[in-house]
Amino acid sequence: MAADPKDTTVTDENTETAATAEVETVASAPTSPAQKLSAEALIKAFETEQMKSDLPEIYVGDTVRVGVRISEGNKERVQPYEGVVISKRHGGMNQTITVRRIFQGIGVERVFMLHSPQVANIKVERRGKVRRAKLFYLRERVGKATRVKQRFDR
């Protein structure tokens, strides 16, 4: 008897086990809220994997040099940006620092995500001695008044 093209019965043992495995995976799909938390755990695990481990301890008031990756055409270079850390925000993967510097007499502030691929490296040039968590008052100061005392114990 010739094989009928409309015949859909399959007697291969491997395909039978594959079909039963598909049925089992469909049955074990997450339906309860407890199993949906595993997705959050998966995201958190991915974020911790992406975090940089070679970052120095950065405090508000420190003078830092941030190496910023800049791509011009098909070339990529690292441009240093040096200034005083005036604020730190968030934590973990989304941690940011705001760095302020004076360029040609004008105050320039940039916010850097510490774990971003655009940040090539960070080096602490000097430690600052401050008594505030945010140094926004430096925005109104001019000249020597913007200097932060140096801290030697860290």
Swiss-Prot record:
Keyword Ribonucleoprotein attached: yes
Residues spanning the signal sequence: none
GO CC aspect terms: cytosolic large ribosomal subunit
Keywords: Ribonucleoprotein, Ribosomal protein
InterPro entries the UniProt entry points to: Ribosomal_bL19 (IPR001857), Ribosomal_bL19_CS (IPR018257), Ribosomal_bL19_sf (IPR038657), Translation_prot_SH3-like_sf (IPR008991)
Residue ranges, annotated region (Disordered): 1-33
Bilayer-crossing regions: none
Keyword Translocase (UniProt): no
Pfam entry (one): Ribosomal_L19
Alphabetical GO biological process terms: translation
Biased composition (Low complexity): 16-27
Molecular function terms, GO-annotated: structural constituent of ribosome
Chain's role: This protein is located at the 30S-50S ribosomal subunit interface and may play a role in the structure and function of the aminoacyl-tRNA binding site.
Family: Belongs to the bacterial ribosomal protein bL19 family.
Protein name per UniProt: Large ribosomal subunit protein bL19
